[in-house]
Amino acid sequence: MPLGAFVSSQEIMSTLTHNPVLGHITTFGGHPVCCAAGLAAMKFLQDNKVVEDVERKGALYEELLADHPAVKEIRRSGLLLAVELGEASKLYCLIDLFIEEGIMSDWFLYCDTAFRISPPLIITDDEIRNCVALIRKCLDRL
């Protein structure tokens, strides 16, 4: 079941209260199972300092990929990366190569010249290195 939050100014909230009526509520809003799972996940993230390491891990991806000649640019926020190739035709071929290697990725709906990397926050450095090795193997085949 999903867990979400809605944060708003009083002005916007009062509008959504009436038009549509209760337009700010969710189907599972406040469901105890969702809240318990969300609380446990937050506790794990805090106790294990997972978020504190996200920037370093994202930088590692960037460092290991940036020097490949097929990579034109890397845009990144933490562990959310867009790797720009500059040409849609190259990216379409790359996605097919990714599938052959068991890599799950795709282009962005708004940008068909870049592929996404969005690993779990708990990814290890060794897993990042293995992932980048596979990505580079595919890039080399373009």
Stretches with model-predicted labels:
Residues 1-142:
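Conserved N-terminal phosphate-binding loop of PLP-dependent enzymes in the Aspartate aminotransferase
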